[in-house]
Amino acid sequence: MSLTNEQIIEAIGQKTVLEVVELIKAMEETFGVTAAVAAAGPAAAAAVVEEQTEFNVVLVEAGDKKVNVIKAVRELTGLGLKEAKEKVDGAPQVVAEGVSKEAAEDAKKKLEEAGAKVELK
């Protein structure tokens, strides 16, 4: 029994991005081809989306509770009082660089609870 194009598209649509990437690699190896576009222009930006694994925690603004934010920065970074205060006063500043998604979300939560505005990049 042969699958129709619609059945194939439906099956691919149910896969995660990671599974589709693995499928593409397997097809490239099996058929000896590449999925790269020959001369892609700016309009043909069909890049495979990969999930980001490393994040930077950026302190955007200290907010009203600056003392609490300084305490949170010290706790997260291990900086001294002076260095943590300089980081908070100089916002926007990177508080944590190249951390996992879970660690970045934890840091963001702690800083926001202290009253800061935070972004993950």
Curated annotation (Swiss-Prot):
Keywords (A to Z) from UniProt: Ribonucleoprotein, Ribosomal protein
InterPro entries on file: Ribosomal_bL12, Ribosomal_bL12_C, Ribosomal_bL12_C/ClpS-like, Ribosomal_bL12_oligo, Ribosomal_bL12_oligo_N_sf
Any single GO CC term annotated in Swiss-Prot or TrEMBL for this entry: cytosolic large ribosomal subunit
Disulfide-bond pairs as recorded: none
Keyword match Ribosomal protein: yes
Annotated GO MF terms: mRNA binding; structural constituent of ribosome
Keyword Phosphoprotein: no
GO biological processes: translation
Residues that span the membrane, as ranges: none
Family, per entry: Belongs to the bacterial ribosomal protein bL12 family.
Role according to the record: Forms part of the ribosomal stalk which helps the ribosome interact with GTP-bound translation factors. Is thus essential for accurate translation.
Assembly and binders: Homodimer. Part of the ribosomal stalk of the 50S ribosomal subunit. Forms a multimeric L10(L12)X complex, where L10 forms an elongated spine to which 2 to 4 L12 dimers bind in a sequential fashion. Binds GTP-bound translation factors.
Protein name per UniProt: Large ribosomal subunit protein bL12
Organism ancestry: Bacteria, Pseudomonadati, Pseudomonadota, Gammaproteobacteria, Pseudomonadales
